[in-house]
Amino acid sequence: MRWLWPLAVSLVVVLTVGLSGVSGAATSSLGGHRAKVQEQQSRPRRGTKDEGPKEVQHYVPEEWAEYPKPIHPAGLQPTKTLEATSPNPDKDGATPGNGQELRVNLTGTPSQRLQIQNPLYPVTESSYSAYAIMLLALVVFAVGIVGNLSVMCIVWHSYYLKSAWNSILASLALWDFLVLFFCLPIVIFNEITKQRLLGDVSCRAVPFMEVSSLGVTTFSLCALGIDRFHVATSTLPKVRPIERCQSILAKLAVIWVGSMMLAVPELLLWQLAQEPAPTAGTVDSCIMKPSADLPESVYSLVMTYQNARMWWYFGCYFCLPILFTVTCQLVTWRVRGPPGRKPECRAGRHEQCESQLNSTVVGLTVVYAFCTLPENVCNIVVAYLSTELTRQTLDLLGLINQFSTFFKGAITPVLLLCICRPLGQAFLDCCCCCCCEECGGASDSSATVSADSKLKAEVSSSIYFHKPRESPPLLPLGTPC
């Protein structure tokens, strides 16, 4: 039985060690279970506000932008996206949900932002002024186009009227025609719709053409005045052959090139400016502001021209032709003597022709001064009182400035057709032949007409529309009478 004691001792040791291990394992497992339960209780449930991944989803970028949503293909597409200045539209004291409303107000309807303003319909308070401007523009356009085309066609188709004098008048009519045909529709369209046709190109081309037209008129009046002075003081015979085409083109080239060279700074001075309209879209306007991309030397010259433009405009395009005409007329009157005394070397018909030419020069100068005076007054007022005037007043002065140029282009050919007898008679003959088909039959039915009357009719018709077979005799200087 002695061997049972070691067995009993070993069993007691094994049991003691096993019970202690089991109790430790149970205790550790119980502690681990409690820790797991506490961890599960401390972890927030899914969908609550304290969830970790949700904090990452609340990231707000520094700037947010709205991109155009797909719209109907027939609608107008916005030109650029609109960005908000605030990082979060819900902040800065705004209530939640105002961000979407802000974006809708900024974006607006594309058709409303890019549509052309039409003040003619529906009829409002501004419609009456728009209709008045359109009616006045149509009258000026019709009168100017018909008159200038008539002067150019008469001089072109008449052999006896192809002199330097009449060619200068025809070139004057050509420039007035170009100004009325191209500049008048652009200016009226901009005044009514507040949109500029051809954009920046028209802002530069319209002032260039208008100033070139003023230069052509100025130098033409100076050339006509010099011609009258030369005729009055020259001791050479008062008649000479019809001038050749090369001589006429050389004189016209001097006038045209000089006028266009003086108008070149207008191409670099004007720019297109767009401002937001109070209702919808933008308002186009042309402003005098040289481009910063110009070379430094050119930019300084343009700035100098801008600063001196008003007085240069007044001196060169207003005072110069008036002083030239007045001086030449005074010298001519002094050389020719009082109206009652006629020189012995001059016939009565030639004296009448020269008097008519002098009246033409004086009439052109008076009309030119009358039409350009409002333009110069507006330039001076804008230069010195622009800060004290409202935007509506400045726009009105600009419109008066433009219409004064258009009035000059429309009244000048009418004056030429009324004062210059050959041009006026040719215009009436042309209208009679175009409107009355019985003009030719009336001459055939009159069988009792004398031979002198027939000869006079043939000479009269050949003067204006037919080139004679042989070289014509010597003709008086200027417009034949």
From Swiss-Prot:
Localisation per UniProt entry: Cell membrane; Cell projection, Cilium membrane
InterPro entries: GPCR_Rhodpsn (IPR000276), GPCR_Rhodpsn_7TM (IPR017452), GPR37_orph (IPR003909)
PTM description: Undergoes metalloprotease-mediated cleavage which reduces its constitutive activity.
Sorted UniProt keywords: Cell membrane, Cell projection, Disulfide bond, G-protein coupled receptor, Glycoprotein, Membrane, Phosphoprotein, Receptor, Signal, Transducer, Transmembrane, Transmembrane helix, Ubl conjugation
UniProt KW Transmembrane helix keyword: yes
Domain remarks in the Swiss-Prot or TrEMBL record: The N-terminal region is required for constitutive signal transduction.
Official protein name in the record: G-protein coupled receptor 37-like 1
Organism the protein comes from: Mus musculus
